[in-house]
Amino acid sequence: MKRSLALLTVLVMAAACGEEKQQPLAPAAITLNGDVFDVAQAGETIALEVTAPSRPYVTDCPDWIRTEAVGAFADYQMTINLTSQANYAFENRTGTVTLQAGALSRTVTVRQAGREKPEPSVGESAAEAVRKMGAGWNLGNSLDANSGDRTHMWIEASYATPVPANYETAWGQPVTTRALFRMFKEAGFNAIRIPVTWYPHMGTIKLQWENEDWHWDMSTWTEYDVDPVWMARVKEVVDYVLDEGMYCILNVHHDTGDRGEEKKGTAWLVADQFDAAKDRYAALWQQIAETFKDYGERLLFESYNEMLDSYDSWCFATFASPDRYDATVAAAAYAGINNYADLFAKTVRATGGNNATRNLIINTYGACSGDGAWNSHLTDPLTQLALPEEPGHLAVEVHSYWEADKFDAQKADIDRLFSNLDRYIVRRLGVPVIIGEWGGGNVSDEVAARFAGYFSQKAHDAGIAALMWMGLSDGKDRAVPKWTMPLTKDAILKPYLP
């Protein structure tokens, strides 16, 4: 009996030993379930099966591919998901993902098709739209009004729950009415630009009481959704313009611009900081585009207003730097402008509807026009601009401000401005030009009219749509409505009279 029990014990132990899992041998190289993957244009997730002697890590990856480890590294094996974003470009793209495991490395190629190019549009071209716009005007200091200073958020602090009218009237203008635009249309204007500042109406602005004032820590600004009440008001004002039969330009305004010497400003779109803002920027334009996707061709979208570099340089990139020019930062700023323009166009086009062929406006760096001859870099904002898509439904915008009381001394400079726009934009890029803002300073109606008549005639002769910044009807006059500068109004319209 004892002998039988001993034999049984030996057999059980032998069986148990036989059931032990054999530890696999460490591989000598990294092996994958594929070296090249083709993914869908709409985006796709690939399960990359990796076998390696040690835990593999992704060390390099294009920004349109997101990587995520699935589960643990066990038995020298691991799964890594490669998720590609949708490719809204018309061109195919290829990216390389690099894996590292100890001293070993391996690359994976991901290929993604672009969108199919649409059939040639039968809609109005940008050149036709600009030609029809003629003379225009800016509804300034209304929907673009904002606190503007992160250390003094006075509008938000003044109201428990601000409503659109609190912003619209904050800078001294009345609530906008349809009658105002009817007055402009009946006079002969055919285009209105509606500047809109969006940051106060995206997500939540959380205020903190510091140094006896209300501050905004922008790092707490995480949400992207636009307040539907604000969007409804913007839509209402756009409808006013379109209902009067005029062209309407809708933009992203004081989300760009000068942030001041101590960088207290609220501008969050900076030319050489594209990566920091691209997700919010795309989300903003996606919401605007979806809201207006069924609107007709008389509505144009403008990418951004006056976007500056991290030095807040006007005239050309890095002019405000200590040495008055920094080639590295300037290159990043111009590349950033082109990246923002590209993202803007692709985001709008991807929403479909009439946005597939809507005329879009791309602004130069700072909306700089290249006027002047005192520095060789003045034309850089024009020469460094690249188009995000083929010409046809694109226009380029610049801004131009002068001193009307020095008009006689500036005629040659004004002439050179229009010559540069023709040379560096119209002929080089093959797109029309819009002067989205122009003016002659704070002068009398009589002085402004003389300058404005000349400037408007130059724009008319060049086939450029020019929209004056405010002035023509401001403050209490807008509520009537009536003209604040009737002589200037007449001078602007004279070249367009039959």
Predicted regions and their residues:
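Bacterial Sec-dependent N-terminal signal peptides
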Residues: 5-6, 11-36, 107-121
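Solvent-exposed, low-complexity, repeat-rich "mucin-like" stalks and linkers
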Residues: 28-59
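Surface-exposed binding patches on compact interaction domains or structured appendages
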Residues: 52-79
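Short, surface-exposed loop/turn segments at beta-strand-coil junctions that are enriched for proline
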Residues: 85-90
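A short beta-strand micro-motif common to beta-rich folds, especially ectodomain repeats
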Residues: 91-103
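Active-site mouth of glycoside hydrolases
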Residues: 124, 130-370, 474-475, 492
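Extracellular glycoside hydrolase catalytic/binding regions
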Residues: 163-165, 282-300, 304-465, 478-495
